[in-house]
């Protein structure tokens, strides 16, 4: 499992507003080219998004847990692999903390980890740091 944590002087609601606005990740994160909703309405459990990231095949992610102001989980599946990403915002003293995790399961999980594990770790760490920095700038 890949984990990354970033602390921010910003209030938790500000950090949440950035991390949960997945449709704008392409504008905010160097690790994401574009996120396109596959459907309409508010983001919540069942929402699906097509995500394109540099050097990775496009993936469809579906929200499986949505706790407004606190956390969301989404899952992407492809043959032999299930990817699960969790995004959690918490109060941390006078500011906030963002915890990100990415886990792979399935018969090809170990192969994927060997192929892109280092790259994925760097991307998750970059995302955590970027959201924390952007929250402080707003």
Where are these regions (language model features)?
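Hydrophobic ligand-binding cavity/cleft-lining segments
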Residues: 1-40, 136
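Short, hydrophobic/aromatic-enriched beta-strand segments in well-ordered soluble domains
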Residues: 6, 98-102
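Generic recognition of short, well-ordered alpha-helical interface segments
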Residues: 10, 27-30, 58, 122, ...
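Glycine-rich portal/gate segments that line the openings of hydrophobic small-molecule binding cavities
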Residues: 27, 36-84, 92, 97, ...
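A conserved amphipathic terminal alpha-helix motif
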Residues: 103-138
């Amino acid at each position: 499992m890949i984990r990354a944590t970033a602390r921010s002087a910003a209030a938790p609601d500000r950090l949440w507003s950035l991390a949960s606005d997945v449709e704008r990740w392409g504008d905010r994160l160097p690790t994401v080219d574009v996120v396109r909703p596959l459907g309409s309405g508010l983001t919540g459990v069942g929402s699906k998004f097509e995500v394109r990231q540099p050097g990775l095949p496009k993936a469809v992610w579906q929200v499986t847990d949505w706790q407004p102001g606190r956390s969301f989980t989404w899952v992407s599946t492809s043959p032999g692999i299930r990817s699960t990403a969790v995004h959690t915002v918490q109060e941390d003293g006078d500011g906030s903390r963002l915890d990100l995790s990415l886990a792979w399961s399935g018969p090809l999980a170990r192969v994927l980890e060997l192929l892109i594990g280092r790259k994925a770790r760097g991307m998750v760490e970059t995302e955590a740091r970027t959201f924390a920095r952007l929250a402080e700038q707003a």
